[in-house]
Regions:
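Conserved SAM/SAH cofactor-binding pocket of Class I
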Residues: 1-53
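Short glycine-rich, flexible loops that bind phosphorylated cofactors or substrates
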Residues: 45-47, 100, 137
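Mobile active-site "lid"/loop adjacent to the S-adenosyl-L-methionine
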Residues: 43-72
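Flexible, glycine-/basic-rich loop-and-beta segments that form/coincide
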Residues: 131-146
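Conserved Class I SAM-dependent methyltransferase catalytic core
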Residues: 68-132
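Class I S-adenosyl-L-methionine
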Residues: 51, 62, 69, 83, ...
Length: 146
């Protein structure tokens, strides 16, 4: 819903399309392939949810629970993304603390040869970007990863 509002407010209607889907459900039959897939999936390990700050605990459990190790959604998305992306597309994830290397490795196993992990302003690994080697984003990601 927020992405659609942003498309409208930035006057990108007609140039940008958005789709919302359940990443753990069966893959939807989308028309065409995506240039960009961005995901901020639930990434908190199930056992850690009870110990979260009260304000975070008020969030719907589906927005928090990433499974036993917090990586369930990343496994599914990295497996399915190559089937739904253009050859030189870009995959971007927000990640939880200490998940950067695991998510980066999943991207590599899925065939993304250019992978970069970026830190937030507090110095915590927060984003993973992935693209096919030789694609239009590959050189940029390799530069970011340095």
């Amino acid at each position: 819903a927020v992405a659609k509002k942003n498309v409208t407010s930035q006057k990108l209607t007609g140039r940008v399309s958005t789709n919302q889907a359940d990443a753990l459900a069966e893959p939807a039959a989308f028309l065409g392939k995506f240039d960009l897939i961005v995901s901020n999936p639930p990434y908190i390990p199930a056992a850690d949810i009870a110990g979260l700050a009260k304000d975070v605990q008020n969030e719907p459990i589906g927005a928090l629970d990433g499974g036993e190790d917090g990586l369930d959604f990343y496994r599914r998305i990295t497996k399915e993304a190559p089937l739904h992306m253009v050859e030189d597309g870009l995959l971007a994830f927000e990640i939880g603390i200490y998940q950067g290397e695991a998510v980066a490795e999943m991207c590599k196993v899925a065939g993304f040869g250019a992978v970069a992990i970026r830190k937030d302003y507090a110095g915590i690994e927060r984003m993973v970007f992935a693209a096919k080697e030789g694609g239009k984003y590959a050189d940029l990601l390799l530069e970011i990863a340095k």
